[in-house]
Regions:
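Alpha/beta-hydrolase active-site loop
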Residues: 102-124
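Short glycine-enriched nucleophile-adjacent loop
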Residues: 118, 142-153
Length: 283
């Protein structure tokens, strides 16, 4: 996976309040311009960085920073610098140069997510501590997060998976992409899992879970009709078998986006990130 994150730009201020300032940003991801938002808390800092990976929203209706606005606000008020990447092809970002319409299981988006961290590090913003990095991914963004954690485990210190898609790319493909034009082109290029298991393994974080280093906080609702809860059941079990640090929280009755349990979800998320991203006092 080629990685080059550079030229972070704070383009303009979207809004400001007593807790944080929200900036429209752009950065270069492998030479492409990718847009997003960055919430920087008030105060001296430096504040830990949390990257947000959003779920699937059609590019035709997507707008800058869309998808996790409540969560962006909450964590910024908790003292985290929150960078929400739009991904290539979304918001004000450049389009992907790959026009084959072959399913890639979010690997390009994972590049954009990692490159966001690298761009912040290059920029050396005085109020952001980019050596302490958390990541939060919802749905598709949960899959993007798993791709980051398994391909470049040194990048992220702690991760929150919010109703994530499957770690097996074939399962995601057959559930959402197989009936589209992309499905036909993908089958032509890669075949099925039975025909070409190595190709599908290469797209799947499932086969690389042993690489994972960061502690994970995993959430899923029992009434999620978009992403089956048993996918997270299986992921939690597999991570536990591998000896990885995972905490799995199931919310009875919650759907794909939490409502009654949202406050509890965010309190647990903030507590986890504070614990994992706070520097250890050497004294």
């Amino acid at each position: 996976m080629k990685l080059e994150g550079t030229e972070l730009m704070l383009e303009y201020v979207i809004s400001t309040n007593t807790a944080y300032t929200q900036h429209a940003i752009s950065y270069k991801s492998n030479g492409l311009t990718v847009s997003g938002i960055l919430n920087i808390p008030e105060g001296e800092g430096p504040f830990p960085l949390v990257i947000f990976n959003h779920g699937h929203i059609p590019a035709s209706i997507y707008t800058r920073g869309r998808g996790l606005r409540r969560e962006q606000d909450y964590l910024a008020r908790e003292g985290f610098a929150v960078l929400h990447t739009d991904y290539r092809g979304h918001g004000e970002s450049d389009e992907s140069p790959d026009t084959r319409m072959v399913y890639d299981a979010g690997l390009e988006y994972a590049m954009d997510s990692i490159n966001a961290v690298l761009a912040v590090r290059e920029a050396k913003l005085p109020k952001i501590d980019s050596t302490r990095v958390g990541m939060l991914g919802h749905s598709l963004g949960g899959g993007v997060t798993l791709n980051v954690l398994t391909s470049h485990p040194e990048i992220v210190n702690a991760a929150v998976l919010y109703a994530p898609v499957n770690s097996d790319a074939w399962e995601n493909f057959t559930r959402w992409r197989d009936e589209r034009e992309e499905g036909d082109r993908t089958r032509e290029a890669l075949g099925t899992r039975e025909e070409n298991p190595s190709a599908w393994d290469a797209l799947s974080s499932l086969t690389e879970l042993s690489n994972l280093r960061a502690p994970i906080l995993l959430f899923h609702g029992t009434e999620d009709s978009d992403v089956p809860e048993d996918w997270s059941d299986t992921l939690s079990q597999r991570l536990t078998e591998l000896g990885k640090e995972v905490t799995y929280i199931e919310y009875e009755g919650e759907k794909h986006e939490f409502i009654p349990k949202w406050k509890d979800f965010m309190e647990k998320t903030a507590s986890f990130l504070h614990q994992e991203l706070t520097p250890v006092d050497p004294s």
